[in-house]
Every structure is written in C-alpha cells, then in structure tokens.
C-alpha cells in the first residue's frame, strides 16, 4: 500500500499543480448586468426607517452599532448580495476597513453557506483616526462601505483555490493589487452610489482633518485607490 501511495503522489501533485495553474484570476471588478437604483447625491439629514431597510437587505446582514443606517443603505445597493451572509463588525485592531471571508465556509460545497465579514476598526488613538468610519460624514460612510461590499461581490464569484491565488497575487504583485482596488472603487458607481464614494475620496484627501494624513500617505493612496477627480470623471462616463 505504501508503494502505491508513493507512486501516486507525483501524479496527484501534478494534477493539483495543473488545476491551480489553470485557474485564471483577473484583478478587475465586473460591472453588474442590471440597472442600479440611482441614489440621491446627498443621503445625509434624511429620515430613514431601519425596519424598512432591513426588509430590503434581508435578515442575514449584520449591522455595526452606531452605523446601522449607513450600512443598511450600502447593503441595499447590492441586490446580488441579498442571499449572502455578511456581517459588519467593529473591532479595535487591523486596517481601517477590511472585507474578509470565513475560510472554512469557503470549503463547503456551493455558495449558500459562505460567510463574509467587513471589519471596521473603531479603536481609540490610532494613526489613521481621520479616516475611521466614525470620523467620516454620513455620505462618505455609505461610500466606503459600498466599496467594501464590492470586494465581497468579487470574492463570491471565486472558488476556494481561486481565492488562494487571488490572495497571493494581491500581496505580491503591486499592479494586480492596484487594479483590483481601483476597480473596486468603481463598484459604488456601478451600484448607484457614485456621489458617496466620490465624497469619501474627496474627504480623505481634502478635508482639513485629513490633510496631514493624506500628505503622509499620498503615494500609496493615489496609486492603489482612485482620486476624487478620477472618480468624478468615471461618474460622468457612467
């Protein structure tokens, strides 16, 4: 039996290698094939009924405490995610915002059991305080949450092997990383929240509270994410 296993191992390794290499992963986001609801340019200072929003987004969506309305509006822009389990969680560590997936749920057959999380750093006295969700105006909050949901749309189209390849390319190939993030910035535009992602990009670059932060990270931000001017140009084309 051991000899058979030894003889089969190179064959199995070859099959696995070929399978992995055959997975073609592109970094670009894809424009949805439906006409989105076009949200107003300004969503702040309106009366919202959270229960009505929950009825639209489904009961499988977690809402972060204190940001329920902004999160629910962002969810509502993504009808393709209505049946997908997603939680938005406040945390005290990590990046300012990060879309993530439960790796074990990715191993299950089909996609109905997959679980995703959007981690929202809410720690005190971080070096990126100016761009934390709590520091942003309401429309900018909706815009950046819509960006994070765009990542989940992308993840949900991949299988387990593809997710692994994507992650490896994301952290090792700058061009892949940049294309993915910059086209994810387009997802709010594609889902009717162009004004909101524009307001986010404008705020984190132009608001007095963010100027110092932006100047220190300008090269990174403008390489991997669209500027407000670039987003405005895209909005005019869409």
Regions found by a protein language model. Name each.
Residues 22-111:
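A metal-dependent hydrolase signature that marks the N-terminal structural subdomain at the beginning
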Residues 98-139, 155:
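Active-site scaffold of zinc-dependent metalloenzymes
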Residues 143-156:
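Active-site recognition of the HExxH zinc-binding catalytic motif
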Residues 177, 190-238:
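Long, well-structured alpha-helical subdomains associated
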Residues 55-60, 132, 170-174:
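Second-shell loop/turn segments in exported
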């Amino acid at each position: 039996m051991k000899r058979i296993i030894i003889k089969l191992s190179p064959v199995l390794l070859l099959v696995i290698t070929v399978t992995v290499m055959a997975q073609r992963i592109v970094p670009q986001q894809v424009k949805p094939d439906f006409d989105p609801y076009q949200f107003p340019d300004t969503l702040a200072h309106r009366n919202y009924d959270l229960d009505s929003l929950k009825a639209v987004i489904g009961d499988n969506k977690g809402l972060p405490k204190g940001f329920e309305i902004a999160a629910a509006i962002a969810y509502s822009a993504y009808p393709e995610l209505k049946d997908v389990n997603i939680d938005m969680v406040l945390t005290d560590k990590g990046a300012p915002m990060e879309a993530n997936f439960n790796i074990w749920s990715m191993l299950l057959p089909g996609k109905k059991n997959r679980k995703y999380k959007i981690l929202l750093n809410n720690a005190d006295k971080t070096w990126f305080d100016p761009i934390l969700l709590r520091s942003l105006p309401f429309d900018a909050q909706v815009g950046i949450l819509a960006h994070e949901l765009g990542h989940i749309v992308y993840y949900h189209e991949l299988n387990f092997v593809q997710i692994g390849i994507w992650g490896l390319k994301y952290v090792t190939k700058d061009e892949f990383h940049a294309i993915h993030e910059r086209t994810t910035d387009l997802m709010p535009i594609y889902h009717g929240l162009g004004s909101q992602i524009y307001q986010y990009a404008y705020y984190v670059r132009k608001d007095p509270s963010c100027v110092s932060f932006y100047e220190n990270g300008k090269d990174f931000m403008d390489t991997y994410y669209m500027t407000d001017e670039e987003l405005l140009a895209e909005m005019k084309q869409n």
